[in-house]
Amino acid sequence: MATKAASSSSLPKSGAISKGYNFASTWEQSAPLTEQQQAAIVSLSHAVAERPFPANLVHEHVHRPENGLSVSVEDTHLGDSGAIEAVLVNTNQFYKWFTDLESAMKSETEEKYRHYVSTLTERIQTCDNILHQVDETLDLFNELQLQHQGVTTKTKTLHDACDRLLMEKQKLMEFAEALRSKLNYFDELENVSSNFYSPNMNVSNSNFLPLLKRLDECISYIEDNPQYAESSVYLLKFRQLQSRALGMIRTYILAVLKTAASQVQAAFRGTGGNKTSVSEGVEASVIYVRFKAAANELKPVLEEIESRSARKEYVQILAECHRLYCEQRLSLVKGIVHQRVSDFAKKEALPSLTRSGCAYLMQVCHMEHQLFTHFFPASSEEVSSLAPLVDPLSTYLYDILRPKLIHEANIDLLCELVHILKVEVLGDQSARQSEPLAGLRPTLQRILADVNERLTFRARTYIRDEIANYTPSDEDLDYPAKLEGSPNTTSETDLRDDENADVFKTWYPPLEKTLSCLSKLYRCLEQAVFTGLAQEAVEVCSLSIQKASKLIIKRSTTMDGQLFLIKHLLILREQIAPFDIEFSVTHKELDFSHLLEHLRRILRGQASLFDWSRSTSLARTLSPRVLESQIDAKKELEKCLKTTCEEFIMSVTKLVVDPMLSFVTKVTAIKVALSSGTQNHKVDSVMAKPLKEQAFATPDKVVELVQKVYAAIQQELLPILAKMKLYLQNPSTRTILFKPIKTNIVEAHTQVESLLKAEYSAEEQANINMISIQDLQTQLDNFL
């Protein structure tokens, strides 16, 4: 055992062993055995616990002789098969033999283990050498990897540097190209200058427009980059060249336009100066066809200018071209237009002149717009472009119409002019959405405004003279004879039909004039203007009718005056109903009355004139107050009509049942006096008597009262209804007006009947013989 321990302790320390052990431990931990596997290992360990001797061990053969112990041992140690044979005689020899045998066996076993240890040591050494070589190889690989990484890093750095250099090269090339392209704009100055100042350069040259375009590009670029060195100097020089080029264009256009105008005038004179050629059509007229052909070379230049109209320089030159064009066109057509309008004024009346003149100007404007569109297609929708041409032409018509309008006093003719301008002329333009005629619209609207102003003035004068200040004649106030002599045909609501024109003869003239005037003005004037005129007309017409009613009362009867007023107010109310306006006007006026008290305080020394800090200072109270008052002519008309109807109803009621009303009033007074508890005993004794014993209420008096009322119903009410029918042709109107009269009559009879039943006996009631309420209502209904 000592030898074995010594052998094991003599094993060298090896990295292979530790690494193998660590690997085995890791393996054991990483791959634990199951219980079944562990049981199998235990079984195997028990099975191999007692190993048999190796085949090369010594085989012993023990022979027992007859006279002693014989032992034969065969040793095969290290391949030697020698035999140890000994004859054991005594114990001592046996012990000696056994000791030798034990030593031989131990020696043999130790030799085997030594050989195994030696072999294991060699293997361990070999493994250590291999591990050492592997470590050295790994170190070499690590060093090689580090060197590779270094080479890779250097290579990547080199590649990055190359890429950076390529990018810098590309940027420098792009910068150089950009710098070259930017410098080209500055370098163009010399090229453009030499071309523009060349004696052979003119607008008709094929290189002129490309040079102008390049010049504009240079100016735009320098304007967008003012930070460049000497940019202001170059910009100034480029602008000078641009001004020169635009001046050349202006001169060229003016020369071509004048040449074209001269050719047209020469051709026009060659035709004998026919003044009517301007109205014969666009394509056939020498003024348009020749001018278009003569000036056709301007079209490319004008199109270039219009395409650059976003720049202010070209806006100015384009406006100048428009002006030059309009001047030349005006010089050609103004004489013809003026002559034609003058011919219209000499031959035609004002409405026909307005219609013909507007139609002629519309035709001329249409042709001029077509020609203008040929040269300036992009500017054709701008109304102001042709204004220098259209305004003078339309002024010729305006100058001829205005003096005639100022002196025109006929409202019908002025209304006709409004219709012509608003419907036939301006309305026709709006319907067609005609751009060529848009330039004529301001002048037409100006003429229409003058006509409206004149019409408004004449309408106010007419209202003042013919309605408000109307002086009626005896024939105008001859009512009811005027109604009795006319056919009773229509009602108040059917007065606008032509077949009922005779009914106007029964009207009071201011009413007919008011309605006629308003019906004419309604479609002609603006709503605000018409509202003011309508309110004024209705107000003064109502006052005029009221004045006439008072005069009729003096000439005829009160009832005639009332019915006259009711009739005409009803007609006026019904006839103004279709006008979709408010007959109210708000009047504003300044009120300085509040300053009086403040001035008094200043004069008394109680306030200061220049005390700016106080609210009572004159400066603070100097501003006037604005007072607003609203006048509604329609409401005033309704109020007057209602008052007149109530007066008529009460007058008829009193005329028929006045005795009954007086009787009821006296009875009521007696009852009130008795209920008030007066102190006059003498009077109380008189009033305390029964009603039928009163002097005014005896049965005979009541009989007389009833007969008097019944006679009034028969004799007075029927003529009143006949007169109502004469004044008021509409049955529904008469029914509405008679209904409260009937109600009042029935109410008076009802009150008297109640008193009779309460105060008189049945015999007395029979003697009085008062008509029943039902019979009375039937009788009154039959009157209608």
UniProtKB/Swiss-Prot annotation:
A GO MF label: protein homodimerization activity
Superkingdom of the organism of origin: Eukaryota
A Pfam family that the UniProt record links to this protein: COG3_C
Localization per Swiss-Prot or TrEMBL: Golgi apparatus membrane
Disruption phenotype: Male-specific transmission defect due to incorrect deposition of cell wall components and proteins during pollen tube elongation, thus leading to disrupted pollen tube growth. Embryo- and seedling-lethal associated with white seeds in siliques, delayed embryo development from the early stages, arrested at heart stages and resulting in abnormal curled cotyledons. Altered Golgi bodies morphology. Impaired Gamma-COP and TMN1/EMP12 tight association with the Golgi.
Membrane topology reported for the UniProt record: Peripheral membrane protein
Keywords recorded for this protein, A-Z: Golgi apparatus, Membrane, Protein transport, Transport
Disulfide bonds: none
Region of interest called Disordered, as start-end residue ranges on this chain: 475-495
Record-level GO cellular component terms: cis-Golgi network; Golgi membrane; Golgi transport complex
Known partners and oligomeric status: Homodimer. Component of the conserved oligomeric Golgi complex which is composed of eight different subunits and is required for normal Golgi morphology and localization. Interacts with COG1, COG2, COG4, COG5 and COG8.
Role noted for this protein: Acts as a component of the peripheral membrane COG complex that is involved in intra-Golgi protein trafficking. Involved in pollen tube growth by modulating Golgi morphology and vesicle trafficking homeostasis leading to the deposition of cell wall components and proteins at the pollen tube tip. Required for sporophytic development.
Family label: Belongs to the COG3 family.
Protein name (Swiss-Prot/TrEMBL): Conserved oligomeric Golgi complex subunit 3
Organism, as annotated: Arabidopsis thaliana (Mouse-ear cress)
